């Protein structure tokens, strides 16, 4: 487990700067993942989506404070640090989303009265930040060897004013979009684990984006 | 006997009820608790509303103050929500800085205001580049018995409908603002977002309007905020068990009916208040 695993994936090879226009459809930016790059945490991963990059570290299963311990499950904690400034209310809300998603897949009952801490650091933000954080957290949990019943992935999509769907939007596309939807889907049953949306959209558009 | 069983095995106790398609408090799976709303109770606030969803009680007070707009949006006012969950409402909360639950709820309400465009921020402008209104919306929970997000959204909507802003003119010579307290006008509320919360049990069963105990036993929660045209302002599903597309569809239709119920209730209350 000491060697670095470097996975590179290209779907419809495109430059990840976002300045080149992407047509509607299913093209994602170039994404990459690197595991086991930090020496102190039990597991770590860096996930890159275009220019958005998030670094995740997982400590666990480790000792837990008596006030926080759950008698039959592991206590999951997520800490999200923004690139600039101190963590605020928006970060707390995102931490809650990521934590609940991880709790749904991690087999906490195998490690009762322990804590699993996921620390996420935003390295650069160029759109689809929440999706990138989810992916980084998942890869870091895998690298740490935490037992999970499924893998999950985060996907962001933006709906612009005429209803066209763009996957993995850049910050410019997110700003111009009417709505930005972020989903987390699990790998085994393809069910919706987490959903967080920004903006107004109709129900049919939601169903289209989910498919 | 039942109380003992409930303490020892709360999940099994609940499952027995859910098998019969009902809940311990006698409700059906898709039934909401009795909703009551009281508008204009706080006389020192510019707008206020008290909402009770069964036992869950949330009061919202809106205060309007002056502020200088930011340079990149000189004609936009501000709406600043803040949800407070004091130790009064439940033994889970301690006094001190806002805990995670309160921060998440505040962020949720801020997102709802932003996404649904309930108020056009340009309406809050008095003098572009110099003076705008800032509406501080403080939501305080007085009794926490589950489903705080629905109650907060409803309280916010009712309070904003109750807000009356005085007319402000900028005096040309002194460049000071003159407030005419005698002439007040209501805010222009463009949409009516209504939140409907669901709790997921055992990855399959969906119940509407969970109480505090049900939220604790649930494996996941889902909140849908809809406006009157059936447009979704927010689909908030913070993790938890997975949901299939068909289940989500059921939730959507329930949210639509709930929206109609809430709108009817609000219109009745507003109508009864108007001749003042």
From Swiss-Prot, chain B:
Record PTM N-acetylalanine, positions in chain: 2
Subcellular location: Cytoplasm; Nucleus; Nucleus, Nucleolus
A GO BP entry: RNA catabolic process
Record GO cellular component, one term: cytosol
Molecular function (Gene Ontology), one example: mRNA 3'-UTR AU-rich region binding
Entry keywords, A to Z: Acetylation, Cytoplasm, Disease variant, Exosome, Neurodegeneration, Nucleus, RNA-binding, rRNA processing
Quaternary assembly: Component of the RNA exosome core complex (Exo-9), composed of EXOSC1, EXOSC2, EXOSC3, EXOSC4, EXOSC5, EXOSC6, EXOSC7, EXOSC8 and EXOSC9; within the complex interacts with EXOSC5 and EXOSC6. The catalytically inactive RNA exosome core complex (Exo-9) associates with the catalytic subunit EXOSC10/RRP6. Exo-9 may associate with DIS3 to form the nucleolar exosome complex, or DIS3L to form the cytoplasmic exosome complex. Exo-9 is formed by a hexameric base ring consisting of the heterodimers EXOSC4-EXOSC9, EXOSC5-EXOSC8 and EXOSC6-EXOSC7, and a cap ring consisting of EXOSC1, EXOSC2 and EXOSC3.
Described purpose of this protein according to its UniProt entry: Non-catalytic component of the RNA exosome complex which has 3'->5' exoribonuclease activity and participates in a multitude of cellular RNA processing and degradation events. In the nucleus, the RNA exosome complex is involved in proper maturation of stable RNA species such as rRNA, snRNA and snoRNA, in the elimination of RNA processing by-products and non-coding 'pervasive' transcripts, such as antisense RNA species and promoter-upstream transcripts (PROMPTs), and of mRNAs with processing defects, thereby limiting or excluding their export to the cytoplasm.
Family (UniProt): Belongs to the RNase PH family.
UniProt disease annotation: Pontocerebellar hypoplasia 1C: A severe autosomal recessive neurodegenerative disease characterized by cerebellar and corpus callosum hypoplasia, abnormal myelination of the central nervous system, and spinal motor neuron disease. Affected individuals manifest failure to thrive, severe muscle weakness, spasticity and psychomotor retardation. Vision and hearing are impaired.
PANTHER family recorded: EXOSOME COMPLEX COMPONENT RRP43, EXOSOME COMPLEX EXONUCLEASE RIBOSOMAL RNA PROCESSING PROTEIN
Protein name per Swiss-Prot or TrEMBL: Exosome complex component RRP43
Upper classification of the organism: Eukaryota, Metazoa, Chordata, Craniata, Vertebrata
Protein encoded by which gene: EXOSC8
């Amino acid at each position: 487990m000491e060697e670095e695993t470097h996975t590179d994936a290209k779907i419809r090879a495109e430059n990840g700067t976002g300045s080149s226009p992407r047509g509607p459809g299913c093209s994602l930016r170039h994404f990459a993942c690197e595991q086991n790059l930090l020496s102190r945490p039990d597991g770590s991963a860096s996930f890159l989506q275009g220019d958005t990059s998030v670094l995740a570290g997982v400590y666990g299963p480790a000792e837990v404070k008596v006030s926080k311990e759950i008698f039959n499950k592991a206590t999951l904690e997520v800490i999200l640090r923004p690139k600039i400034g101190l963590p605020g209310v928006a970060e707390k809300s995102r931490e809650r989303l990521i934590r609940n998603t991880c709790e749904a897949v991690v087999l906490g009952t195998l490690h009762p009265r322990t804590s699993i801490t996921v620390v996420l650091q935003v390295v650069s933000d160029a759109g689809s930040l929440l999706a990138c954080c989810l992916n980084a957290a998942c890869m870091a949990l895998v690298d740490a060897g935490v037992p999970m019943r499924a893998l999950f992935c985060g996907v962001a999509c933006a709906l612009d004013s005429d209803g066209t769907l763009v996957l993995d939007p850049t910050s410019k596309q997110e700003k111009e979009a009417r709505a930005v939807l972020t989903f987390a889907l699990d790998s085994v049953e393809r069910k919706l684990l987490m959903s967080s949306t920004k903006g107004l959209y109709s129900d049919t558009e939601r169903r289209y984006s989910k498919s | 006997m039942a109380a003992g069983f409930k303490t020892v095995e709360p999940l099994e106790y609940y499952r027995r009820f859910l098998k019969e398609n009902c809940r311990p408090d006698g409700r059906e799976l898709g039934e909401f608790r009795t909703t009551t709303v009281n508008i204009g109770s706080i006389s020192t606030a510019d707008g206020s509303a008290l909402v009770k969803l069964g036992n869950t009680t949330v009061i919202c007070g809106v205060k309007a103050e002056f502020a200088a707009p930011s340079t990149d949006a000189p004609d936009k006012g501000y709406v600043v929500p803040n949800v407070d969950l004091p130790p009064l409402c439940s033994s889970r909360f301690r006094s001190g800085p806002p805990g995670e639950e309160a921060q998440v709820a505040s962020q949720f309400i801020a997102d709802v205001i932003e996404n649904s465009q309930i108020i056009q921020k340009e309406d809050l402008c008095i003098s572009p580049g110099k003076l705008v209104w800032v509406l501080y919306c403080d939501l305080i929970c007085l009794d926490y018995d589950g489903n705080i997000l629905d109650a907060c959204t409803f309280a916010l909507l009712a309070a904003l409908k109750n807000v009356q802003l005085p007319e402000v003119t900028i005096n040309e010579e002194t460049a000071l603002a003159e407030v005419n307290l005698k002439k007040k006008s209501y805010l222009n509320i463009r949409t009516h977002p209504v939140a409907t919360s669901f709790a997921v049990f055992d990855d399959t069963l969906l119940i509407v309007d969970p109480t505090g105990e049900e939220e604790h036993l649930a494996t996941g929660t889902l909140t849908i905020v809809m406006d009157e045209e059936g447009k979704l302002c927010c689909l908030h599903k913070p993790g938890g068990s997975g949901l299939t597309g068909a289940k989500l569809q059921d939730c959507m239709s329930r949210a639509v009916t709930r929206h109609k119920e809430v709108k009817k209730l609000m219109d009745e209350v507003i109508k009864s208040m108007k001749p003042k």
